[in-house]
Amino acid sequence: MSYNTQQDILDFVEDNNVKFVRFAFCDIFGTQKNIAVLASDLPKAMEDGVCFDGFMKVEESDLVLRPDLSTVTILPWRPTEGRVMQFFCDVEKPDGAAFGGNCRGFLRQMSRSFRKLGLTCNVGAECEFYLFENDD
């Protein structure tokens, strides 16, 4: 999917029976986390972000997820009725300032640093899993 505007995404939600929207981000340990909202809450979430309690001191713990509209995808393993859509998000402070634990922001910063040196930064995910035999 390739959508350029919030209205494109809202039209897609309506046309494709999307019921839930997941806002995904990685914590400072690299573990993917998700916050899910009803599709009816999507316009506000795209405009204002999704607030959540972070993982810092109490007085600094409020954080905001800002969805990257270019990363929208339908989760294929979910039902076709009441579908689930996902965005990857950047993590920011409530005032819009950068959050130091935002892995996507850190990667963008490193990529810019590499380009200034005339280098290319290629990054990929490594999926690992274990298979266990059942003793039944």
Regions found by a protein language model. Name each.
Residues 1-136:
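ATP/Mg2+-dependent ligation/transfer catalytic cores
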